Amino acid sequence: MTAPLWPNKNEKNHTVKRALSTDMTSNILSSTNASSNEENSRSSSAANVRSGTGANTLTNGGSTRKRLACTNCRNRRKKCDLGFPCGNCSRLELVCNVNDEDLRKKRYTNKYVKSLESHIAQLETNLKNLVQKIYPDDEQILNRMMVGDVLSALPDSSQVSINYTDQTPSLPIPATRGTFIIENDKVSQPLSSFNQQTEPSTLNSGIFNTQKQNFEESLDDQLLLRRSLTPQGEKKKKPLVKGSLYPEGPVSYKRKHPVKSDSLLPVSSLTAATDPSTFSDGITAGNSVLVNGELKKRISDLKTTVIVRGLNDDNPNSINNDPRILKSLSNFYKWLYPGYFIFVHRESFLYGFFNHSKNNYEDSSYCSVELIYAMCAVGSRLTPDLQEYSEVYYQRSKKTLLQLVFDEQSTARITTVQALFCLAFYELGKGNNQLGWYFSGLAIRVGYDMGFQLDPKVWYVDDNNLQLTQSELEIRSRIYWGCYIADHFICLMLGRTSTLSVSNSTMPESDELPEVNGTEEFRFIGRHVLQISLPLKNLIILSRLVQIFTSKIFIESEDIARKLKYLNTFNSQVYNWRQSLPEFLQWSKTLIENDDVSTDPTISYFWYCYYIVRLTFNKPFIEDSQESETVVIEIIDDLKTLLDNFGKKFGNYTKGNLYQLYSCLLAINCLKKLKEIRSSEQDSWNAQLDFFNHIFYTQLYPAYDLPKKLQEDTELETEQENQMLNQVGNINYTHDFSLSHEIDDLIRELFGVGTPQKL
């Protein structure tokens, strides 16, 4: 039991006074020497007490007044002994913060408060009139600005005179719209509540005290406050940026043309212009162009949009009339869409392709020359007669893209991102993994530059001044999540960590978008209605599982038992994912054997993606895990059925895709391992291996050059291995890991953790 803090209630004040007057200074000085770090963290008011003025009294201009209780005791509603540190803080080991100023008796007169309300009401009236003139039909802007909070509380603001002759010291008027923000936006209090009984300390603290100091300290603070407001009086919306030399937006964003006053008007006012001569030819308003006074049409509603070809084609030799281009694009959308090309939304691209061909597609939001050639480079590979043009299209797109990306004056566009991803898949099909990785990484960098992972309303593009329609917002969402799936698929195939992440995006989910009339030539003729949104959402979930377990299974250096534990967890999670799929996306052995369903590329791509994920994770552990071996054998049987049905349905594999290409490659590698493990079933493995080898090396080539490249690399590796066997006896390899060990020891010493293992 500790002794009571106050032995005698009657002697409490005398004891404190005597103890503080005799021993306070020496005790504080000794405690200062003992713990200097604690003293530095105390408030400036406590420093005044330590100077020897007395713990229970404070001197201010010759007058002596009693010190207040410390902050901790006031918050806990405990009696403070007015010591320093007080008994309660000492017992609880808290920092004793002394309040050196009593604000409870400092009150402002009702006359002064009324004058503030009158002044703000007059400002709100002027602001309301200004907003109604600029935006006559937009009541939402007034609601967002909260104009009228004080004005509505006053019976007649015009009769209240503004008089600041009160004896109360003048205070700066906060630059807020009807709301006081105290500290860091944690507490808000309407101005109209000032005619009620409020705590006077609020008026002399928080925003008043802070802004008074800021306004009096420097003129720069006042200028900064004005610059932070738009001409309409709203606070400027800052984009979500991190520490950067370019905090106001992307690095390369520059408008191509100076913004004129006409381009700042709403779209309705531009289209309603009665005098076409007021607009010069070629004036750009974002990505919509005023040509001879007519605003180029945008996608207002996909449900009512119709693509009519030939209306704006004055030149029969234009790119959208080239039969080779049309056939290549038809192959692209018939056989490869959606798949890993979800990011090239078909309806918006074709709308721009057929309607915005003038000015070389410079004014189209979702179509560009480099994107057309990139898509044609991919689509032309699926027709033997057009394969010779594939490299030509690729070089044209590549040359244009590199000029755009590495030109400081160019503007980041979403079509640039789409084209770079198309070239990445083109290079992967040729077996150039390095170039494919470079192009995909460049696409993501350009996308980040325009903020494509953020809300589609705040993308840094040239159409920021035009209000986007709901369909355009949904198209942008579809493009981003398509890029997300493309990035994760490429990283899965190349064994890299993905770049795009769900946690770093504020993009809303992609909704189902309708098919537009006029795109029949670019659709796969099947018996099922195309659905993209639902499969896309579930692929995002699957990619998230892959992202989580990739680091645990393939990156972190753990023993094989720990990796197998993570692998079993991953297999169970993916199994649960498949079982939880909606009925439309579920499949079984019966559905796989159905020729109409399993050969439909708009449906089977979802299955191939699942199989590729399972094979990629289980292939390295076939020798170590019975579960992995069983999973691989079951998947190989399903893939054999799918590929066999595709060959029987269409007669060949010239219209195959990368999903089929990589699934064949994974199946071949798995079968080679199974031959080593189960030598008793050699005949079965050899038969299946011949099946996949035939499709991979003879059927999918020459549409894809990857099989040929792998065959050449295998022969080259065999020659190099033979040469190394003859030279290995004469080579001494010296590996110096001293720096690595030194860094590991330093990390262990600083953070108290051990490194996974030493090399």
Curated annotation (Swiss-Prot):
PROSITE patterns: ZN2_CY6_FUNGAL_1, ZN2_CY6_FUNGAL_2
Region (Disordered) location: 1-61, 229-254
Cited Pfam families: Fungal_trans (PF04082), Zn_clus (PF00172)
Localization (cell): Nucleus
DNA-binding region(s) from the entry: 70-96
Composition bias type Low complexity, residue spans: 30-51
Residue numbers covered by motif 9aaTAD: 744-752
InterPro entries cross-referenced by the UniProt entry: Transcr_Regulatory_Elem, Transcription_factor_dom_fun, Zn2-C6_fun-type_DNA-bd_sf, Zn2Cys6_DnaBD
Keyword line: Activator, DNA-binding, Metal-binding, Nucleus, Phosphoprotein, Transcription, Transcription regulation, Zinc
A GO molecular-function annotation: zinc ion binding
Residues recorded as bearing Phosphothreonine in the entry: T22, T755
Chief location category: nucleus
UniProt comment concerning the protein's domains: The 9aaTAD motif is a transactivation domain present in a large number of yeast and animal transcription factors.
Reported function: TY1 element enhancer binding protein. Binds to the DNA sequence 5'-TCGGTGGTATTATTCCGA-3'.
Protein name as catalogued: TY1 enhancer activator
Native organism: Saccharomyces cerevisiae (strain ATCC 204508 / S288c) (Baker's yeast)
